[in-house]
C-alpha cells in the first residue's frame, strides 16, 4: 500500500478512532456535557424540569454513541473496499472491528473515574456501526452489488 492510499483511506479511520478514544476520557463525561446541554435547554425552554433535562441529555449522549460508531464503520468499510473485492467480507470486517473497538472503548471508560463502562453502550455502538454500514453502502453506489458478491 502506498502512502497516498494510506493517507486517503486509513488515516481518517485512525483519526476517528483517536477522536472516539479522547471522547472516552473525562473530557466528554456526562458531567462535562451537562454544562452545555442543560443551559442550552433552559435557554430554549426556561420552564423545563430537571428530569426532562436529564432525559434529553441521556438521549443526546446515546445518539452520540450511535453516530460515532456509524461514522467509524463507514470509514472502515470505505478503507477495506479499496483492497477487498468482496463487499460482504469488507462489510463483516468493518462491523467486527467497530464492535471490538466499542467493547475496548467501554473497557477503557471503566477505568476513567468520571465514566462507567456499559454493555448496553456496546450494543448501541454496534447498532450504530450496522446502521452506518447500511447507510454508506446504500449511498455509495455499492448497492448495485449484493452483500457477498464481488462488486
Model-based region annotation:
Residues 142-151:
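Short, basic, low-complexity termini and linkers enriched in Ser/Thr/Gly/Pro
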Residues 15-20, 90-110:
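Small-polar-interrupted transmembrane alpha-helices in polytopic inner-membrane proteins
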Residues 57-61, 101, 117:
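Catalytic tyrosine of NAD(P)H-dependent dehydrogenase/reductases that use a Tyr as the general acid/base
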Residues 102-126:
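Interfacial helix-loop-helix junctions of multi-pass membrane proteins
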Residues 1-74:
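"…centered on the first transmembrane helix and the immediately adjacent amphipathic helix/loop
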Residues 68-82, 127-141:
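Membrane-interfacial alpha-helical segments at the cytosolic side of multi-pass membrane proteins
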Residues 29, 79-83, 87, 111-115, ...:
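Membrane-interface elements of multi-pass transporters and channels
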Residues 5-9, 83-95, 115-119:
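Membrane-helix interface segments
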Amino acid at each position: 500500500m502506498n502512502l497516498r492510499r494510506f493517507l486517503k483511506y486509513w488515516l481518517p479511520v485512525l483519526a476517528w478512532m483517536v477522536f472516539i478514544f479522547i471522547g472516552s476520557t473525562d473530557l466528554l463525561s456526562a458531567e462535562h456535557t451537562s454544562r452545555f446541554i442543560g443551559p442550552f435547554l433552559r435557554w430554549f425552554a426556561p420552564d423545563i424540569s430537571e428530569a426532562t433535562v436529564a432525559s434529553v441529555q441521556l438521549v443526546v449522549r446515546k445518539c452520540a454513541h450511535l453516530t460515532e460508531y456509524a461514522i467509524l464503520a463507514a470509514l472502515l468499510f470505505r478503507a477495506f473496499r479499496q483492497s477487498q473485492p468482496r463487499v460482504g467480507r469488507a462489510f463483516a470486517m468493518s462491523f467486527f472491528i467497530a464492535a471490538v473497538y466499542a467493547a475496548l472503548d467501554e473497557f477503557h471508560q471503566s477505568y476513567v473515574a468520571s465514566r462507567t463502562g456499559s454493555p448496553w453502550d456496546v450494543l448501541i455502538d454496534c447498532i450504530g456501526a450496522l446502521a452506518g454500514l447500511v447507510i454508506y453502502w446504500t449511498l455509495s453506489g455499492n448497492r448495485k452489488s449484493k452483500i457477498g458478491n464481488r462488486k
